[in-house]
Amino acid sequence: MKPSRLSSLDPVKMPEWRWAPFLSHAINAFIPLKPEPYPVAPEFLQREGKTGSKSQPIRVTTCTWACRTKKFRQVRAACVEAGRSASVLNFVINPYHTFDLPFFGADLVTLPSGHLLALDLQPAITSDERHTKQVWERLMPIFEHWRVHLPEGGPIPEEAKPYFSPGFLWTRLPLSIEGNQLIDEVIMPAFKDYLNLYLDLVEMAEEVSPQRAFKLLEGQKRYLSYRAKKDPARAMLARFHGHQWTESYIHNVLFDL
């Protein structure tokens, strides 16, 4: 059978996938940046699996959309559709370490227990004001504008705090008409605002000195190492596609620096 996706830039086509409008908006926003395919092994471009019971199996599709640009080392979207079991968009922008930029992160997850939704511009070096000040000054008004419309998602583990900004927008919503309305009326415009700010920061960013670039690279490596070690999707992906595939996907695609 011919693979349905041959390039990381090929469209992600998953009927009923909840998060398609979010990825579509992001992809359109990248068009002026002239994105090129990011190298992703064929077995990770699209993977089919099953979950559920023998009598009521549920089809699982996992796709990876990815690109790179002049200032982005890797932009990647991990997309999962598993019917009533899960619907996921994990979207991360990894800038080149030669630019003093944070990561962009969006984690949009639907599980049987509800929606878990998070947006952030995540710092590579939290303690470095040169790295964070200009970002947080512009991010916090956006965060404050949208946070009042959403319930709190809960506390952040102490060990994770260095990897998030004060503008970490994090909420849990019920599987209900009200939850869907908040996704459409709050989460989607917040996603657009966070992404617009990020792309504005990227446009203004200029290359840094080799010494500064080395410091940023070390910060990026710490962040990605932590994310790979603590990836909350690990158990779900292993259940859908097996342990070996999942570990390779996490370390060689999602957090590959």
Swiss-Prot record:
Tell me one Pfam family matched here: Fe_bilin_red
For this protein, the Enzyme Commission number is 1.3.7.3
Keyword Heme carried by entry? no
Q: Name one GO biological process term.
A: phytochromobilin biosynthetic process
Q: Which GO terms describe its molecular function?
A: cobalt ion binding; phycoerythrobilin:ferredoxin oxidoreductase activity
Q: What class of enzyme is it?
A: oxidoreductase
Q: Which InterPro entries match?
A: Ferredoxin-dep_bilin_Rdtase, Phycoerythrobilin_Fdx_Rdtase
The lineage's top-level taxon is Bacteria
Q: Which reaction does it catalyse?
A: (3Z)-phycoerythrobilin + oxidized 2[4Fe-4S]-[ferredoxin] = 15,16-dihydrobiliverdin + reduced 2[4Fe-4S]-[ferredoxin] + 2 H(+)
| Keyword terms, alphabetized | Oxidoreductase
What is known about what this protein does?
Catalyzes the two-electron reduction of the C2 and C3(1) diene system of 15,16-dihydrobiliverdin.
Query: What PANTHER family does this protein map onto?
Result: PHYTOCHROMOBILIN:FERREDOXIN OXIDOREDUCTASE, CHLOROPLASTIC
Family according to the record: Belongs to the HY2 family.
Name this polypeptide is given? Phycoerythrobilin:ferredoxin oxidoreductase
* Source species: Prochlorococcus marinus (strain MIT 9313)
